[in-house]
């Protein structure tokens, strides 16, 4: 849990957890241009760390430089400003970001930062807004943000905002991120992208229990993976390396590729076999967002 000072003027060390898409099916394209999808989102105990300090002048300020992300377009600033305007909050905030997740990796880093901001400021500004209200704000910031506010592992539909909580077994994951940025919008616009996967139900997923044995290759797929691996040799190389060892899958629109293990030792043993210089992390599954209690 994050630490709050005695004067309740700050919240420190707030985790913005990464997510994995255990599968990702694209079932259609909506009139508004968004793609309809189905997925299961898995939270990880690995992510960026955010620190929030109250300001009395009402200003929202990001005090950490994030290369390539101007302050005014940063999702944490947009989230704080949106929440402030909605609630009529008079206080401001300084936001520090300890960026640990790679960008353009399919791990939800920016979206998770935004959700952690909404949850933390709901507590720090003493707004006491319900989770449903925060989720309605979250969807204005991006398709993945509502999941992180929802705060539980989930079966997702729509553009990712229609969520049902799902219990997943404890797992350790090895996540490998090639040093390439995959632009999500460009992948969604590719003509070769599958957009007609047959819809499933949450019952289908739970009945097959692919996550218990032989997963992740025993249930579904990531419809974006063939497109990304055909365009980015770095991602294809990681997928190929994993398949010589254990089943693996790309998360989101990439570039990260992951495999599941039953123990930390197994995940670290696989990590030790990676080629020198590859960017990787071992992380444990989580069942609930660390700031889940900051909204009702």
Swiss-Prot record:
GO terms for biological process: isopentenyl diphosphate biosynthetic process, methylerythritol 4-phosphate pathway; terpenoid biosynthetic process. It comes from the Bacteria. It catalyses: 4-CDP-2-C-methyl-D-erythritol + ATP = 4-CDP-2-C-methyl-D-erythritol 2-phosphate + ADP + H(+). It is an enzyme of class 2 (transferase). Keywords: ATP-binding, Isoprene biosynthesis, Kinase, Nucleotide-binding, Transferase. Its EC number is 2.7.1.148. GO terms for molecular function: 4-(cytidine 5'-diphospho)-2-C-methyl-D-erythritol kinase activity; ATP binding. Pathway: Isoprenoid biosynthesis; isopentenyl diphosphate biosynthesis via DXP pathway; isopentenyl diphosphate from 1-deoxy-D-xylulose 5-phosphate: step 3/6. ATP binds at residues 102-112. InterPro entries: GHMP_kinase_C_dom (IPR013750), GHMP_kinase_C_sf (IPR036554), GHMP_kinase_N_dom (IPR006204), IspE (IPR004424), Ribosomal_Su5_D2-typ_SF (IPR020568), Ribsml_uS5_D2-typ_fold_subgr (IPR014721). The active site is at 19, 144. Pfam families: GHMP_kinases_C, GHMP_kinases_N. The keyword Repeat does not apply. HAMAP family: IspE (MF_00061). Catalyzes the phosphorylation of the position 2 hydroxy group of 4-diphosphocytidyl-2C-methyl-D-erythritol. Belongs to the GHMP kinase family. IspE subfamily. This is 4-diphosphocytidyl-2-C-methyl-D-erythritol kinase. It comes from Burkholderia mallei (strain ATCC 23344). The gene is ispE.
């Amino acid at each position: 849990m994050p630490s709050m000072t005695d004067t309740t003027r700050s919240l420190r060390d707030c985790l913005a957890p990464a997510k994995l898409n255990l599968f990702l099916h694209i079932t259609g394209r909506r009139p508004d241009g968004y793609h309809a999808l189905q997925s299961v989102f898995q939270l990880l105990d690995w992510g960026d760390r955010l620190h929030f300090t109250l300001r009395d002048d009402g200003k929202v300020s990001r005090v950490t430089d994030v290369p390539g992300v101007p302050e005014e377009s940063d999702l944490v600033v947009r989230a704080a400003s949106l929440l402030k305007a909605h609630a009529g909050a008079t206080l401001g905030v300084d936001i520090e970001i300890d960026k640990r997740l790679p960008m353009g990796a399919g791990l939800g880093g920016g979206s998770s930062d935004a959700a952690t901001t909404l949850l933390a400021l709901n507590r720090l500004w003493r707004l006491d807004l319900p989770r449903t209200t925060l989720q309605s704000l979250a969807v204005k910031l991006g398709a993945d943000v509502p999941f992180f506010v929802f705060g539980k592992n989930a079966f997702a539909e729509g553009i990712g905002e229609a969520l049902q909580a799902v219990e997943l077994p404890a797992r350790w994951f090895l996540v490998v991120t090639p040093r390439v940025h995959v632009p999500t919008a460009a992948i969604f616009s590719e003509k070769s992208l599958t957009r007609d996967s047959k819809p499933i139900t949450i019952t289908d997923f739970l009945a097959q229990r692919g996550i218990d044995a032989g997963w992740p290759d025993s249930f579904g797929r990531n419809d974006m993976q063939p497109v990304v691996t055909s365009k980015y040799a770095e991602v294809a190389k990681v997928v190929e390396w994993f398949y010589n060892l254990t089943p693996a899958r790309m998360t989101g629109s990439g570039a990260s590729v992951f495999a599941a293990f039953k123990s930390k030792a197994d995940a670290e043993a696989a990590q030790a076999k990676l080629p020198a210089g590859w960017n990787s992390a071992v992380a444990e599954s989580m069942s609930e967002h660390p700031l889940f209690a900051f909204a009702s």
